[in-house]
Amino acid sequence: MENSKQVKSTEDLSFELSKPFDKSEIKWRPQRQTKDGTSALVLAYVDVRTVQDRLNTVMGIDGWQCKHISYGAKTICHLGLKFNNDWVWRSDGAGDTNFEADKGAISDSLKRAAVHFGVGRHLYDLPSVFVKIQKDQRGQIKINQDDCWQAVRRKQSDIS
């Protein structure tokens, strides 16, 4: 049986890698709270599985690989993508996170390395915004995702 896999150009792959994520794939996390604890500055992010799905979809499961190396409290991800049978490598790192430190550093370093190939770069164009927050019984911050998007639209309309 003949291999029917169509080879895409580097430009086509780069375009597909850098496509914005669907709004439903983007989440918001608090960066810092106001002194009175009623609002928080929130930042847009995607889960590492969303990045892995993009790499699998665009590059194929055999078209990318990553290696993680720890340097003290920092983790460096070396991410390789196969373009026209040649591996192209980019690296970036992250420190331990407040929640599941090692896992967070591994995930964050992969996401940061993927940005070098355009994956998720558009997230840096979204403004950080303040939104009202709620806290659950354990004191965990709860953020309404719709409130975040409304605040982004307001801020972007103020800028233009």
PLM region descriptions:
Residues 160:
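Accessory terminal regions of nucleic-acid processing enzymes
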Residues 1-41:
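N-terminal, Lys/Arg- and Ser/Thr-rich interaction peptides
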Residues 41, 46-157:
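Positively charged, aromatic-enriched nucleic acid-contacting surfaces
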